[in-house]
Amino acid sequence: MLKVDHASVFFAARDGRTVHALDRVSFDIPERGFVVALGASGCGKSTLLNAIAGFLPLSDGRITLDGRAVERPGADRGVVFQKDALLPWKSVADNVALGLKFAGVNRKERQTRALELLRLVGLDEFANAFPYELSGGMRQRVGIARALATNPDILLMDEPFGALDSLTREQMQELLVSVWDKTAKKVFFITHSIEEALFLGTQVLVMSPRPGRVVARFDLDFIRRFAETGDARSIKASPQFAELREEIRAILHSSEDLRSAA
């Protein structure tokens, strides 16, 4: 289980001001949990993900993964960013296997594992291709496969579909549900899309503008319904989905109004 306990982050801005980015954020991600942090730009979502990844120290609070304190990056956390950061001179398979190479895994085993993961994301036919030959959605699929290569306990995903067109984004959401269902990984996912948060999250954390606080939590099962039925259209068209979308939109607007009035 990932546990975030009263996590707060302050940092110094370039002009010398102290910025309060996160304020006492707490939540858990159990086995097979898919937690989505939802909020406007600048609310601390990426700061929170970077702290969980071990890229950024907390000013106060504690983060643990399976009882171990998170203090630095580790192979137990796989990260997928909005920009795929694939190495252009390496093949798709070699990009996926990069973490295994750093871990000292032999080449034959690396290639076998890379092909398994490319098959999982539907790109095994592109193993020998290079990143420039792939579309944006395909490149993000490679990024997901690469993050899974070292068999992490949790996937950390920082708006990975934000730069994609709407149709590709929906396809990637559905692919991610399939990967989550087959691998049983914990996932922490960041987005500013209400619909994406509702569709993917077993729990959605609605965050306030800076300093980022969790102002509402929603426990959901749309992702499980899709994993069972494969019918995204009826899920998103359901009255429950629409009601929750409007409720969350109202919370986000209320938080913005309070900040503007402060």
UniProtKB/Swiss-Prot annotation:
Keywords, in A-Z order: ATP-binding, Cell inner membrane, Cell membrane, Membrane, Nucleotide-binding, Plasmid, Translocase, Transport
Membrane topology: Peripheral membrane protein
Catalytic activity: taurine(out) + ATP + H2O = taurine(in) + ADP + phosphate + H(+)
Domain ABC transporter per the UniProt entry, residue ranges: 4-234
Location(s) in or outside the cell: Cell inner membrane
One cellular component term from this protein's GO annotations in UniProt: plasma membrane
Chain coiled-coil ranges: none
PROSITE patterns to which the protein is assigned, alphabetical: ABC_TRANSPORTER_1, ABC_TRANSPORTER_2, TAUB
Transmembrane feature ranges: none
Function: Part of the ABC transporter complex TauABC involved in taurine import. Responsible for energy coupling to the transport system.
Listed name of the protein: Taurine import ATP-binding protein TauB
Gene designation: tauB
